[in-house]
Regions:
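An alpha-helical appendage that flanks or caps ligand/catalytic pockets
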Residues: 1-4, 43-145
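Loop-centered beta-sheet repeat module
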Residues: 5-43
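Hydrophobic faces of well-ordered beta-strands that scaffold small-molecule active sites
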Residues: 11-16, 31-36, 53-61, 154-157
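Active-site-proximal loop/turn and secondary-structure-junction residues that shape catalytic pockets
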Residues: 19, 39, 61-63, 160-162
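Amphipathic, non-transmembrane alpha-helical secondary structure
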Residues: 20-24, 40-41, 68, 137-140, ...
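Structural motif
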Residues: 28-29, 149-151
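Active-site-adjacent beta->alpha loops and helix N-cap segments on the catalytic face
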Residues: 37-50, 162-167
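Alpha-helix-loop-beta-strand connector modules within alpha/beta enzyme cores
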Residues: 166-181
Length: 181
């Protein structure tokens, strides 16, 4: 570009990091590889984290002060849908996408108040990333745990409304407070 941009203003380059080929391309380009995370407890239990500093994750967030309210909002926004489930199953049969198969396996763990990691939107072909659902504090804790295993870049699924973005902002503020030095 002419004139050259200051380095701080250069845009980041992101590449899908869900396959070995994508990871190799990201390394070669000096880009950040973006993947779909497992539940953070899996990284913590294994004792080995991915090269998270070189990776970003994509998630959705639905949170409220009260976890029950968050789950009500989540289920209303992403109701189970037989047509979506069939479309998802068909996509699984015809796709050679590694990330699609990985995410489908992750959906086998049910979400609960103990586990905010929720795959129903993906399993019903409504979006293509896991969601974290629960109280502001529980979801902020989960995000801070992802930071704890090394992730530094989080890309959010599109919020449903400006109000939803405000709720996500509360979670981000609380997560930042937990990981601040």
């Amino acid at each position: 570009m002419t004139p050259a941009l200051p380095p701080a203003l250069l845009p980041g380059v992101f590449v899908s990091g869900s396959s070995d080929a994508g990871l190799a391309a990201a390394r070669q380009l000096g880009a950040l590889a973006v993947s779909y995370p497992k539940p953070v407890a899996e990284y913590e239990a294994s004792g080995t984290a991915p090269d998270a500093a070189a990776l970003g994750i994509r998630i959705g967030i639905i949170a409220r002060e009260d976890a029950d309210e968050a789950w009500t909002v989540a289920r209303k926004r992403f109701p189970e849908d037989r047509t979506g489930q069939l479309t998802h199953q068909l996509a699984m049969k015809v796709s050679d996408s590694k990330w699609h198969k990985q995410l489908s396996r992750l959906g086998e763990t049910p979400a609960s108040s103990e586990q905010p990691y929720w795959m129903v939107p993906f399993e019903n072909y409504k979006t293509f990333c896991p969601y974290l659902v629960g109280s502001y504090d529980r979801v902020a804790d989960e995000i801070s745990r992802y930071v704890g295993v090394g992730y530094r870049t989080i890309i959010l699924d599109v919020p449903a409304s400006p109000e939803e973005l405000d709720h996500i902002g509360v979670v981000c503020e609380r997560a930042a407070a937990r990981v601040a030095p």
